[in-house]
Amino acid sequence: MQNWETTATTNYEQHNAWYNSMFAANIKQEPGHHLDGNSVASSPRQSPIPSTNHLEQFLKQQQQHQQQPMDTLCAMTPSPSQNDQNSLQHYDANLQQQLLQQQQYQQHFQAAQQQHHHHHHLMGGFNPLTPPGLPNPMQHFYGGNLRPSPQPTPTSASTIAPVAVATGSSEKLQALTPPMDVTPPKSPAKSSQSNIEPEKEHDQMSNSSEDMKYMAESEDDDTNIRMPIYNSHGKMKNYKCKTCGVVAITKVDFWAHTRTHMKPDKILQCPKCPFVTEFKHHLEYHIRKHKNQKPFQCDKCSYTCVNKSMLNSHRKSHSSVYQYRCADCDYATKYCHSFKLHLRKYGHKPGMVLDEDGTPNPSLVIDVYGTRRGPKSKNGGPIASGGSGSGSRKSNVAAVAPQQQQSQPAQPVATSHLSAALQGFPLVQSNSAPPAASPVLPLPASPAKSVASVEQTPSLPSPANLLPPLASLLQQNRNMAFFPYWNLNLQMLAAQQQAAVLAQLSPRMREQLQQQNQQQSDNEEEDQDDEYERKSVDSAMDLSQGTPVKEDEQQQQPQQPLAMNLKVEEEATPLMSSSNASRRKGRVLKLDTLLQLRSEAMTSPEQLKVPSTPMPTASSPIAGRKPMPEEHCSGTSSADESMERPHVRQANTSASSTASSSGNSSNASSNSNGNSSSNSSSNGTTSAVAAPPSGTPAAAGAIYECKYCDIFFKDAVLYTIHMGYHSCDDVFKCNMCGEKCDGPVGLFVHMARNAHS
């Protein structure tokens, strides 16, 4: 501890003149009373009584405001020698006065902060981002409420410095600190928040509609349109011209510039303000804003707006579905415009687009550099142009052929397991004689395309117990519902499975297809080719109608077994190239109903009944066909007669999607009769499901294989549900939610742990 007895006594005599002048300037004195610095300096032990009395009065007046700081100061300040007691009183008074001034500055600063918090939302409040040249809106506030702070002189600083050595650290800082500058408070928002929040506001503005750029503010009074507008983060709003890129900071300037890009005869101006536009609905929305008319209201909150585009954009704020996701990163957004900006900025690729209910929709694509708002549908996709959402997709199921449904008479129905699952799709029976040639049934490229193009296929030569393509089911039975427990969109599933099956053809199947395609032209009659070619050329395709079926083919016919031959023909490609291939681009799925003639032992009605099998039949143009007379089975001179020999071929169903009529028949066995195998494989087909011999269950050979997971299914519904989880672009990516999995095990674990509705 410091020994004050050995410390040299501080000499205050040389500073008495400064103390006297300080008190003379700040303390009121009696008239005619003056302090002589020289006389005080000559007799330092005799303190002037008038100055001491005034000082005591001043201290008593301020004692109630400064009692605690003075007690602390007196407790921490050591007592100097008794000879300098008079000078110490002058020093204490000066220090107290500086502390009082410091306290006043702090009070004014706190009052200014409170005033700023109450009025920060007003346009006249403080704005740290005020552009240069514009007046500071807080100048009037500080000028009227704050007093200028006196600056300390060099003499006072030099005087306080040696004394502050003996005081505590807090008092030393207060003594050496100049009076505080009353500066405006900084913006409460951080730089990162100020960058993120305006970006979100910009997303909502740019994604809603073109109509919203005039609807951003609630009022268009003279102040708002002629003065810059600042958001809550202090950022000034600007208006950028989409034609030339000029940026304006006020609405009046922006409208004046926009007028230069408009044709004079198309300018529409608001009668109440300088607003101009070329579109009538924009002017209508603007006038509604003047009248405070907001007819569109959100059904989930109190939000109201002047047009439906703004309401649609607002409704996305209530949804938890992020429809647009990036395939290369974790970015997800609800707005298509923001998604395009992300893809352009980072060069990423878009992921699977979701509908408003969260269902994946592979038919929607993102035109990254296009000007069209929202996603667009693929060419020939199941979504009609201009539709983006679950409503558009579901409407395609309803857009089918009512004439097809009305033309079908009431008839006995025999359903299998799959047909029962598909809402009991009826079997079509036929009993009339058809032409002898075997036709080809091309499956539409996508479920959205009408199967009216199938009407160019010739009649089938045998009775039908055929598994129809899923696309035909959806087109001809518009009231068919989805799987109630999986909520599978069969229409989307059909389009995906068509593309998936094409990639899993075995080499053996490709060779068979090439051999069978070479015999296609020899097995068709010229008159049927001419007739159906005329129908395909002269008649227009109605996408909303199904394939018309002749009334004479819709009569009640005895049900007979028929082999379902699924064939995938890839035309105009090196994989499936053949000399007789058609000029259609891409890959086409084909179904061929090759003649499976019944043996004499199978002629009884009991043997004609189809056992329980996961193969349904449908009222497709190839389903209800006339039976082949038995006398045709005796001839062997022509290719048509050789196909009609009473031989039963038995084959196993390959890994083909039943719901989508996928033709993956890599496991198909060869025909039991070698003589009829080459002639019976006309029109480029492979036997996938054949009628079993007498006494053999039909379901014994029905096996469905998933080559991705190396799993076999005996039930078509289970196989269809399983294949619905494989995505077309990545087989181990969940088709329901878009999550990528590691192999088949990861996909099964994902299916078991996550609910897909």
UniProtKB/Swiss-Prot annotation:
Lineage, top ranks: Eukaryota, Metazoa, Ecdysozoa, Arthropoda, Hexapoda
Species of the source: Drosophila sechellia (Fruit fly)
Entry function: Gap class segmentation protein that controls development of head structures.
Keyword terms of this UniProt record: Developmental protein, DNA-binding, Gap protein, Metal-binding, Nucleus, Repeat, Zinc, Zinc-finger
A Pfam family hit: zf-C2H2
Subcellular compartments: Nucleus
Sequence ranges of Low complexity compositional bias: 397-414, 512-521, 651-694
Superkingdom of this protein's organism: Eukaryota
Stated name of the protein: Protein hunchback
Segments of skewed composition (Polar residues): 39-51
GO MF annotation terms: DNA-binding transcription factor activity, RNA polymerase II-specific; RNA polymerase II cis-regulatory region sequence-specific DNA binding; zinc ion binding
Residue intervals of every C2H2-type zinc finger in the record: 239-261, 268-290, 296-318, 324-348, 704-726, 732-756
Cellular component GO terms, alphabetical: nucleus
Predominant location category: nucleus
Region annotation (Disordered) ranges: 30-51, 171-213, 367-416, 511-535, 602-694
Acidic residues bias (residue ranges): 522-531
Family per similarity comment: Belongs to the hunchback C2H2-type zinc-finger protein family.
